[in-house]
Amino acid sequence: MKRLYMMMAALVVCITLCAQQYQELWIIGTAVPGGAQKLTKVSDNDFKYAGRLKAGELRVATAKKAGKRTTYLVADAPDANIVNKGIGYTVTTDAKQAAWQVVVTEDRYRFHIDTEKKQLRGELFQPWGELFLAGGATEVGWKSEGHMLLMKQDLNNPCIWTWEGELKRHPEVEEPGSFKFQGQDRWHPKSIHPYAADTDILKDQRFHTGGDDTKWTLSVDGRYRIKVDLFNETIQAELVK
């Protein structure tokens, strides 16, 4: 009986450790402005960096300064570029093995680390030429390809888009209080989405680019002012009346 209890206790510990999430992740190295930057924890399994990187190397670490317990996320491919479509990683304590490559100095690097899939995906972000709004809560509805609501691009920052207008539930259509943002005047290929389905546009500023077809929803009908930052993947909305 005692042995069975010990085995069950060990199993609980194992499950706990396997499910443990990183509280923080850092990038350090010659490619990182200032030598070290803390990643943004977007969700339990998603860490993000959006900003300038210099030509050089960086390491993804569990601490700003190396210590005995510091671990690193090392790419499964040799000399892995931080710009990629998704490269798996393993965890190591050997900093020498853990370098990711940054080939050129640029201001708009962005990468995500999915700690559940153990994968890093990165890009050199290019501003979009268009951003549209459509859906059940808009005047154009879901059958709106070719006449979605065009947002206005900021003259000083091409990654910022704004829109002001009425959003309200339209009971006669499917998903009457929902809406989405598209990178073209049709449903594919570019789009942005909240992390959870039916996210209140007034309550959560996070979004991801592409992925699951989740939608925003309204808690209140009214006239809205919306600001989307495509590079930093944030959205701000307010009721203006």
PLM feature segments, named:
Residues T62-K64, T115-K117, G183-D185, L230-N232:
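Surface-exposed loop/turn motifs at beta-strand-loop junctions within extracellular Ig-like
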